[in-house]
């Protein structure tokens, strides 16, 4: 069972993520567990103060490293101690899949001016959601919880669900539709209503390729493109030179008509 431990000054911010929706159901079924650790419980003063003024001066308060160390020591050893910080490496779907195969993840959620720099020695990994700054690490940690927990076997009702998600195939996800069949003049693509599973699969793959090309072309070099993908991308205006730069295979050769003789030229 995978356990998520969150070291925070505001456990009430994370409580809904731990008790509601699929994560809450997974906890009830014993598929995973979530522990909320209030770092104030490890302060050694009557006011439960966990921070102090920064050396060298400056605005704000800094969370003490000794408090964090005591809070971590109260937990069983973690496979990863993750510090949420704008300076960390960008969190990806690949990382989520890697983390889902562990048994215990501990998250350090900062506040105010952040942690004493020596907290980095307690972390095994530093993660960031992007190039922006939030008021604390709890929201970022909740995002990682959602991304990782859904990959734990049994958490999703349909085990194939996450395999078709954006990034799982290396591409953005294809568009999905449901009833009504028409809304404000926009209908559902006919191919999705025809019952031809091969045609639906081909349409979805092409839509994922088109979306990725338009919105995140940087993903294409690592998307595991096939010769058929290359052929479709050429119809979207991609050049053979671009395909070669991405490391994509060449499109399949046109099939020769049965009985046709090779052109001697």
Curated annotation (Swiss-Prot):
Catalytic activity: guanosine(37) in tRNA + S-adenosyl-L-methionine = N(1)-methylguanosine(37) in tRNA + S-adenosyl-L-homocysteine + H(+)
Enzyme class: transferase
One cellular-component annotation, GO: cytosol
SUPFAM superfamilies listed in its UniProt record: alpha/beta knot
InterPro entries: Alpha/beta_knot_MTases, tRNA_m1G_MeTrfase_C_sf, tRNA_m1G_MeTrfase_TrmD, tRNA_m1G_MTases_N, tRNA_MeTrfase_TRMD/TRM10
Binding site for S-adenosyl-L-methionine: 110, 129-134
GO-annotated molecular function: tRNA (guanine(37)-N1)-methyltransferase activity
Localization, UniProt: Cytoplasm
Keyword field: Cytoplasm, Methyltransferase, S-adenosyl-L-methionine, Transferase, tRNA processing
Region Disordered, residue ranges: 243-265
Self-association state and partner proteins as the record states: Homodimer.
Function per UniProt: Specifically methylates guanosine-37 in various tRNAs.
Protein name (Swiss-Prot/TrEMBL): tRNA (guanine-N(1)-)-methyltransferase
């Amino acid at each position: 069972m995978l356990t998520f431990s969150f070291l925070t000054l505001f456990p009430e911010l994370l409580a809904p993520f731990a008790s509601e929706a699929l994560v809450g159901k997974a906890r009830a079924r014993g598929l995973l567990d979530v522990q909320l650790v209030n770092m104030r419980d490890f302060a050694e003063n009557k006011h439960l103060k966990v921070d102090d003024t920064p050396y060298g001066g400056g605005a704000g308060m800094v969370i003490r490293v000794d408090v964090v160390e005591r809070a971590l020591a109260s937990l069983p050893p973690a496979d990863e101690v993750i510090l949420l910080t704008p300076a960390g490496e960008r969190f990806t779907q690949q990382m989520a899949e890697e983390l889902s195969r562990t048994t215990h993840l501990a998250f350090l959620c900062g506040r105010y001016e952040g942690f004493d720099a020596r907290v980095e020695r307690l972390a095994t990994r530093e993660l960031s959601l992007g190039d922006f700054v939030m008021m604390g690490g709890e929201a970022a940690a909740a995002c990682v919880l959602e991304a990782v927990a859904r990959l734990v076997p049994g958490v999703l009702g349909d085990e194939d669900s996450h395999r078709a998600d954006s990034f799982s195939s290396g591409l953005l996800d294809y568009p999905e539709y449901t009833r009504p069949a028409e809304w404000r003049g926009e209908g559902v693509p006919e191919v999705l209503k025809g019952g031809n599973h091969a045609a639906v699969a081909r349409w979805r793959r092409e839509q994922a390729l088109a979306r990725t090309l338009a919105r995140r072309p940087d993903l294409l070099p690592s998307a595991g493109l096939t010769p058929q993908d290359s052929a479709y991308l050429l119809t979207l205006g991609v050049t053979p030179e671009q395909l070669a730069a991405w490391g994509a295979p060449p499109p399949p050769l046109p099939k020769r008509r049965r009985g046709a003789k090779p052109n001697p030229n």
